[in-house]
């Protein structure tokens, strides 16, 4: 009976010791934080544009410089890629290191730039002339040539009309002149036969040709003659 009591006490003591050890170990154990990006763990740190940077593996220092880092495959160690003046330069350095380490599985920052750089230049496709297009071109060229010929002919006709009037136009003009009313129709046939000497005597002995030379003298002489006759 004494042996059973001693064994029971020893078992209870062992259980208590194990419980105490578990409590002490739970107090000393620390919970590991979940793996997050560096920017999430360092929220509030870094440069003013660090949180707005969209590039992977790129962060900004407090003094404004940009740094690039990348993790090695199957390892947690980070490789330092350098310090850069702009986030774009740091992203390019990260992309080049990612291609070297991960190959086709690399997650790149500049996908569009890599796609445009790797795409071959588009070759110029030669235009194939179809029968319809050939006929259209020939019709257009023939119509243009015909219009030019018509324009040239019209210009030549205009020149001939202005420089060399036709005989029919002359006949029409003569017919028009003969149909005009004459002086005899108005009883003025005597005025056409008045000689120049009669006109000179009527003017006081002054010729009508002197009127164009000194009209003032002619007017004075005419006034004197009129006064004497009155």
Curated annotation (Swiss-Prot):
Organism the protein comes from: Oryza sativa subsp. japonica
GO CC terms, sorted: nucleus
Protein family according to the UniProt entry: Belongs to the AP2/ERF transcription factor family. ERF subfamily.
GO MF annotation, one: DNA-binding transcription factor activity
DNA-binding region residue numbers: 54-111
Region (Disordered): 1-31, 122-149
Domain of life of the source: Eukaryota
A Pfam family annotated for this UniProt entry: AP2
SUPFAM superfamilies according to UniProt: DNA-binding domain (SSF54171)
Record-given protein name: Dehydration-responsive element-binding protein 2C
Triggers of expression: Not induced by high-salt and drought stresses.
Keyword Transcription regulation: yes
Function: Probable transcriptional activator that binds to the DNA sequence 5'-[AG]CCGAC-3' of the cis-acting dehydration-responsive element (DRE).
Keyword annotations of the record: Activator, DNA-binding, Nucleus, Stress response, Transcription, Transcription regulation
Compartment list: Nucleus
GO terms classed as biological process: positive regulation of DNA-templated transcription; response to stress
